[in-house]
């Protein structure tokens, strides 16, 4: 079984790159494209993403879980892969065709950009990342992602120069993703063999995909529909503000989702082998504290520097992003907690019904709040709805998992880290109003002081309360394989 820490480090390596590259490209793109063009891109991308969601059919989670359960049985692995990929190929072709018809019949404005977004939909045909996730071969997927990011970076600076290059920007964004998926096919025959699947096998896998597709619908409702509703009710410029603020939160969010991506196949394999039990519960409790602590540092850190960060990062045209960023960044601790519960408890234990219910409750909250708040508060209304949705999903999943995981102790520890985050926020907030250097230097000082303060207080709290160990022992635990 692959090393968890090594896999997570692979993911962290990619996330660091994912943080650095947008820091380079986003300020350039925001100035070159402008809020309206970015709104057009975001709106068309959101619509294409709805079709991509249908094409994927819940295959990512179902495929990863199914592969993890048979990763040591090559014959069974070949069968499972062939059955699931057959479903993926058929649905990918079908949905791509439907998307093209949709563009021809219903899209009247910016039709060419919508057409270019079809490349994004086509990626569903070739994405076999779920296979390598299930095999816990994260080195392969991380290498792919790094190549994609670098190709996209150099292409943006080479070919995108003014507001007339929106089409080129769309091709780069979608084409690089397609290229990344295609690279996973190199040397695939050394990993798995395609065998002729049986109709019964395909049917059984299809049922599993549909089960995982249902929560995908709910997730898409409250991660994509907000932009669609915002574009329809408040205009594309408001979508641009909301989307740019969301992107700043989405980058560090990768640290949270990467942890879940690594833990899902590990916990699924433990469940299949019958070794989940007390060991799994202990891992989950530690994961809750670790991920909420990390998410709290990111969340309160982003909120505290938002007034300095936005003008430096995006320019004065995007000052409206400041309150949006401050609000939606607060959702991260809730997302971290819920991510641990679903990837380490609900999904590995096949508690799909509870998982689905929690997401649809969140989707209902999201749609209602967006419909009520966007007409009056525009992008801020969407931000309020997003925060409320993530908090609701977190609460419902916690209620469903309380019979498996004793939450009292990890919850108390997490509250301690949240208090530390609040202290960091207050200090940086006051500091930001006293610094008189240039904007970039002010930002660096705020990040440095806030980060150092959080680390000192967090280590003291962890060693004094959570584990009651010395800092030296904590470092050894972190470095231990």
Tell me what each language-model feature is.
Residues 3-60, 153, 173, 210-237, ...:
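Signature of the first transmembrane helix
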Residues 27-28, 39-56, 211, 226-228, ...:
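Alpha-helical transmembrane segments of polytopic membrane transporters and translocases
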């Amino acid at each position: 079984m692959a090393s968890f820490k090594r896999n997570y480090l692979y993911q962290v390596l990619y996330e660091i790159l994912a943080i650095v590259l947008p820091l380079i490209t986003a300020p350039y793109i925001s100035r070159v494209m402008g809020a309206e063009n970015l709104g057009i891109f975001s709106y068309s991308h959101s619509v294409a993403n709805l079709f991509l969601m249908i094409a994927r059919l819940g295959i990512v989670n179902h495929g990863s879980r199914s592969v993890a359960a048979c990763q040591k049985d090559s014959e069974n692995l070949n069968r499972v892969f062939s059955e699931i990929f057959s479903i993926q190929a058929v649905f990918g072709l079908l949905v791509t065709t439907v998307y093209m018809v949709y563009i021809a019949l219903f899209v009247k404005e910016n039709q060419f950009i919508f057409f270019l977004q079809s490349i994004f939909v086509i990626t569903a045909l070739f994405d076999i990342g779920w296979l390598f996730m299930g095999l816990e071969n994260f080195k392969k997927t991380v290498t792919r992602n790094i190549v994609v990011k670098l190709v996209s970076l150099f292409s943006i600076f080479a070919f995108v120069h003014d507001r007339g290059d929106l089409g080129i920007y769309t091709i780069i964004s979608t084409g690089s993703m397609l290229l990344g998926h295609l690279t996973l096919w190199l040397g695939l025959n050394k990993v798995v063999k395609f065998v002729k699947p049986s109709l019964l096998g395909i049917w059984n896998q299809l049922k599993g995909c549909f089960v995982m597709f249902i929560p995908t619908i709910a997730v898409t409702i409250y991660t994509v529909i907000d932009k669609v509703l915002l574009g329809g009710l408040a205009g594309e410029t408001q979508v641009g503000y909301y989307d740019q603020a969301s992107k700043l939160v989405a980058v560090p969010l990768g640290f949270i989702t990467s942890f879940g991506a690594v833990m899902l196949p590990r916990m699924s394999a433990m469940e299949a082998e019958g070794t989940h039990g007390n060991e799994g519960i202990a891992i989950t409790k530690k994961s809750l504290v670790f991920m909420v602590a990390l998410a709290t540092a990111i969340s309160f850190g982003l909120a505290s520097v938002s007034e300095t960060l936005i003008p430096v990062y995006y320019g004065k045209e995007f000052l409206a992003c400041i309150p949006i960023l401050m609000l939606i960044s607060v959702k991260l601790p809730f997302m971290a907690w819920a991510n641990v519960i679903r990837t380490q408890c609900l999904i590995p234990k096949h508690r799909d019904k509870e998982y689905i219910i929690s997401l649809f409750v969140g989707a209902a909250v999201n749609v209602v709040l967006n419909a009520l708040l966007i007409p009056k508060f525009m992008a801020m209304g969407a931000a309020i709805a997003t925060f409320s949705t993530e908090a609701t999903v977190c609460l419902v999943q916690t209620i469903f998992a309380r019979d498996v995981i004793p939450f009292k102790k990890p919850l108390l520890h997490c509250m301690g880290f949240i208090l530390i985050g609040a202290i960091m926020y207050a200090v940086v907030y006051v500091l930001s109003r006293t610094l008189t250097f240039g904007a970039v230097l002010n930002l660096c000082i705020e990040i440095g002081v806030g980060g150092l303060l959080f680390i000192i207080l967090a280590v003291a709290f962890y060693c004094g309360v959570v584990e009651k160990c010395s800092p030296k022992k904590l470092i050894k635990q972190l470095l231990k394989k």
